[in-house]
Amino acid sequence: MVYDLERTKGVLWLENFVMLALTGGEGPEDSLASFLTSFIRQGQLRIVSEMSLEQLEVMRRLVPGFVEHFQIISVSEMDTPTSLRIFEYFNQYTNRTININFSQKALELSYVLLDRFVRYESFPGKAIRFLQTCANQAFLANRRHLDVPDVIGYFSQQTGIPDFLLRDDLLIDNESLHRFFLARIKGQNHVIDKICSIIKVFKAGLNDPNKPVATLLFAGPTGVGKTATAKAISEYFFGIGQKYQPLIRLDMSEFQHPGQIYRMIGSQGKLVQHVREKPFSVILLDEIEKAHPLIFDALLTVLDEGMLIDDLGRLADFRNTIIIMTSNLGGTQRSSLGFKSYQGHDFEADIRAFFKPEFYNRIDVFLIFNPLDEITIRAITLKELNEVENRDGIKQRGLKLF
């Protein structure tokens, strides 16, 4: 191959540049990249290829010095008009080859959704992949025309994002929204009002696009429904029993020591991996006060810019996440779990005294959960008993708990 290219003065196009470092012997020194280095240095071989910035770093790490023999040309992402023109060309191609046609509004919506929710890839590549998948699924379903509802359905199916968040209607039934949370959260009406407001702001697209959807801190004694509220928010967006499990729950007591930090925010960390796999998620950081202080410093970037870069330089995008932190500061006595003896306690003062101002000030909403009175506890008990009684194993046996 090298002889033919040198003789004809041809140019070698490599589709997968990283494979040069992975093909050959057991180590990098025996790889195909090392073998070709001398030919490239002497001008006997001319190569053109393409790769992402992440792949470039991998090549530099696997075969030091090899990439430096190439002239690197940075290609920026296409602007909106150019991307839409490529959409139209692709639509003409699918119409000609498999008789699938996208409406103009469907193409424009595809761009908007991909730009907002899919941020690890660039245009037009991510658009072509998405439209190709839509066209293939429509072809298998014997459909020939795709409009806005079809694009929303396929996008929701591929990303796990609820379709009602993707539709353009801005109105949310306020009564049904409150009713949903009232059925799941007892004795915390002020919390429900604030959560409903956050959801309506997000649905209307009025939240800051360069930050997480919302950053919430739930404070109060143990057993008043802080974790249950986070689960209810996740259930509202995604439902129960779905294949896509969007609630990312981390017990912060597992990250108390400096050596444990990378288990959360490193390249193999729980939080980074979950967010990269599920960019639209509800993140629950349980008992945040137990985490090592260095984690608070790392979270500053997440709360302020909606981004986190791991130790390999890879980006984790938090701009479509809801971050919920719970804290028991000031409410750790076990003698009265969530009862009225905590009435009047200044939980906010405890939180302010514990966290640095730069961390506390980046929290969007600080919610103090009320202690539970006897009537509320009775209602919660009946609700839990009803759920147990309705389990399949109990119903099949015809058992009654009360």
Residue ranges of predicted features:
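AAA+ P-loop NTPase nucleotide-binding core of proteostasis motors
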Residues: 1-402
